[in-house]
Amino acid sequence: MSFLVLPPEVNSALMFAGAGSGPTLAAAAAWDGLAAELGQAANSFSSATAALADTAWQGPAATAMAAAAAPYASWLSTAATRALSAVAQAKAAAAVYEAARAATVDPLLVAANRHQLVSLVLSNLFGQNAPAIAATEAAYEQLWAADVAAMVSYHSGASAVAAQLAPWAQAVRALPNPTAPALASGPAALAIPALGIGNTGIGNIFSIGNIGDYNLGNGNTGNANLGSGNTGQANLGSGNTGFFNFGSGNTANTNFGSGNLGNLNLGSGNDGNGNFGLGNIGDGNRGSGNVGSFNFGTANAGSFNVGSANHGSPNVGFANLGNNNLGIANLGNNNLGIANLGNNNIGIGLTGDNMIGIGALNSGIGNLGFGNSGNNNIGLFNSGNNNIGFFNSGDSNFGFFNSGDTNTGFGNAGFTNTGFGNAGSGNFGFGNAGNNNFGFGNSGFENMGVGNSGAYNTGSFNSGTLNTGDLNSGDFNTGWANSGDINTGGFHSGDLNTGFGSPVDQPVMNSGFGNIGTGNSGFNNSGDANSGFQNTNTGAFFIGHSGLLNSGGGQHVGISNSGTGFNTGLFNTGFNNTGIGNSATNAAFTTTSGVANSGDNSSGGFNAGNDQSGFFDG
């Protein structure tokens, strides 16, 4: 199994086991001695034959002897030089090993981290160790990344040392002996064929269009990538920008999943570091749709919350609006219980501070239901206002477990989302940490697709910008797995190419066919900086559209959008809409998401009024 996917327990143990650099240094000393012996032999042989030819041995026989002996003397000198080169390379190999071993995490440190995790988990009876567990896991991920980085450096350095070793068979061929070609035959004498086309670099096997070394895939810019369209090093996947990502469409380092923007995330669509889940904004979250850090649950807006839809820090429970609450739908601080309105209360439905007991069904006013501490709610356990549903700590939501405002769905910590588990705002889908996305698992903004950490993409797993297609880490491409820019086709690491697998920059204005303007890729686009098919950019800005048949102002993403700009999805008109068939103008830079809405700052479907969630509101 490749060291790229091995845990630090294995990589550290392998690096610290064995004989170390001692045998390599001993080999260097042996080669040094051999070089000295060969050099002395060459000098002695040359001196002896020259002395014979100049003094005692004359005539045609002496001339023939001198002619036959000269190649052997030359071969001895060449062998001595080769031996000295082997000395240098052996010492270089030892130095590479020592540097890698110094960079590798000590196995005892890895064991201590795992022991600490076990201790924290066993004593985590009430969830009090959740932040410490998250920190320990984040430290473990850093140990993993450090070991992989050390091994990648070791592999690269050792490969470079090996590449500089000259085969001894070349020296054997110089001997005046009929058997020399036979001695030089075999694997050592075979030239390694070029097992790819259009690559710039070495060791790119069965691949095209790479710039860099040892890539197994196509269209990468960087080294040791296993996949296509990556910009960076040692990525296992496609369309990544960064180092050692295990997945696709990530921007940054050491992510396990897709569409993450940040480091050490396990999941998809996270914007931050060390998250485990889907669509989180912040660091160290475990769950989905959280905005903040070290939350455990869904749609928490704050930090160190355990539960869902809490708005504040640190709460344990559901739909609490405030700080240090333990329970459900408390509005205030330091409450223990359900639907308390105030501070420091223990009980249910209490209104005021420092109270113990049971109050009204609803502590708020104008509610229809039970356990509402907010106002004008229809449903259960809402601490926000004007909600239809249950467990909402935000305002004007239609659904449940929303800590943001004006959402239609559940588990949204952002605003005006139609869907679930969105930490961003204005999304139509689920698990998006970015804004105005149509799809799921996007940490970037205004994408239509899945797992994009870039922006304005129509497609999936893009870490670049304004691409139509999938797995692009470059910008303004129409196609697949391009790490270069403004390409039409696939696997290009160069710019402005049409076709497949070119690492070269072309001296043209556009790629593709039938484009009018500058910086376009695809087919029959007009204006500047479009990707896709038959888009028309009439906006004042350089950035155009991605997708198919978009027109009007810039930055439309998807199919057949028109209007003044920033529409994402299908058949939208107006400004800043996400979804299908919306026509809101959003003059105040608000966002509308959903289906067939004409009102501003709305979510859901078929809403004509402003600031609406749900369906069919005027």
Swiss-Prot record:
<dbReference type="InterPro" id="IPR002989">
    <property type="entry name" value="Mycobac_pentapep"/>
</dbReference>
<feature type="region of interest" description="Disordered">
    <location>
        <begin position="598"/>
        <end position="618"/>
    </location>
</feature>
<feature type="signal peptide">
    <location>
        <begin position="1"/>
        <end position="29"/>
    </location>
</feature>
<dbReference type="InterPro" id="IPR000030">
    <property type="entry name" value="PPE_dom"/>
</dbReference>
<dbReference type="InterPro" id="IPR038332">
    <property type="entry name" value="PPE_sf"/>
</dbReference>
<dbReference type="Pfam" id="PF00823">
    <property type="entry name" value="PPE"/>
</dbReference>
<dbReference type="GO" id="GO:0052572">
    <property type="term" value="P:response to host immune response"/>
</dbReference>
<comment type="similarity">
    <text>Belongs to the mycobacterial PPE family.</text>
</comment>
<protein>
    <recommendedName>
        <fullName>Uncharacterized PPE family protein PPE16</fullName>
    </recommendedName>
</protein>
<keyword id="KW-0732">Signal</keyword>
<dbReference type="Pfam" id="PF01469">
    <property type="entry name" value="Pentapeptide_2"/>
</dbReference>
